[in-house]
Design a protein with these regions (language model features):
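Basic, helix-initiating cap at the start of DNA-binding domains
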Residues: 1-24, 28-40, 54
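Hydrophobic alpha-helical connector segments
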Residues: 58, 73-101, 182-185
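Short, hydrophobic secondary-structure boundary micro-motifs
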Residues: 104-106, 174-175
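Amphipathic alpha-helical packing segments from all-alpha helical-bundle domains
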Residues: 116-169, 179-183
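Amphipathic, non-transmembrane alpha-helical scaffold segments
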Residues: 56, 60, 64, 85, ...
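C-terminal peripheral helix-coil segments that are non-catalytic and often amphipathic
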Residues: 94, 157-169, 183-223
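Amphipathic alpha-helical segments enriched in hydrophobic/aromatic and basic residues
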Residues: 21, 26, 30-31, 41-42, ...
Length: 223
């Protein structure tokens, strides 16, 4: 991939970072390769982004913000619960297919699984806790994990609000637990996209995928 050297340096660095992170994942990606592809000096990267982790976060945060706006606009553009679900999943599927590798890095490398950590709701906030007694979570690690957790939480919280309102309006079973239901559906879709076969990716439109997801969520697989 060639980077247009007429672009501003920070844009070139972000474009190069997306290419390198997508090829190698987070841990194996190097700033040296990003610097070479962007055709900038090492000091320029540190000037704009500080370090590799801050660069990666800037890359995904800049993608996440317009994605959230599209999700909100999509669900607000229709009236019925079923149509809102379809619109939500249309936007979600399109984004996750287009950004699959970067969001796999968030899920599998940045959320603490490799460090023996997980995120738990604590009152109105989230906190990082160790999965095992021998694991010690540093403040720096905790802050990093929570940054990436917020990206995903903001995405599925829009779905959670839809499900909560539908339950309150007697459109879903009264024993529905919004948090469990939301994560079950959201991360089920996410993992399906991360692991989809090539023929499904090539043949299925965002609209068709959203229709199937919504239909299975509301009606199941029973005939």
């Amino acid at each position: 991939m060639a980077i247009d050297t007429s672009l501003p340096k920070d844009i070139r660095i972000l474009q190069a970072a997306e290419e390198v992170f997508s090829q190698h994942g987070y841990e194996k990606a190097t700033l040296d390769e990003i610097i070479a592809l962007a055709d900038v000096g090492k000091g320029t990267v540190y000037k704009y982004f500080g370090n590799k982790e801050h660069l990666f976060y800037k890359l995904v945060a800049d993608k996440n913000a317009p994605f959230l706006e599209k999700l909100r606009s999509a669900v607000d553009s229709v009236n019925s619960f079923e149509d809102k679900l379809k619109k939500y999943f249309e936007v979600m599927v399109h984004f996750y297919v287009a950004n699959s590798t970067l969001w796999q890095i968030i899920c599998f490398e940045m959320l603490g699984g490799n460090n023996g950590c997980r995120v738990k709701l604590d009152g109105d906030n989230f906190k990082v806790i160790p999965r095992y007694n021998s694991v010690k979570v540093s403040e720096e690690t905790s802050e990093r994990i929570l940054r990436y957790h917020k990206i995903l939480h903001d995405e599925y919280d829009i779905l959670s609000q839809l499900i909560t309102k539908a339950m309150q309006n007697n459109l879903l079973k009264h024993d529905t637990v919004p948090e469990i239901t939301t994560k079950f559906v959201f991360f089920g879709v996410v993992m399906s996209i991360f692991n989809q076969s090539d023929d499904i990716a090539a043949d299925m439109t965002d609209e068709e995928a959203a229709r199937i997801i919504t239909d299975h969520f509301l009606r199941g697989n029973a005939r």
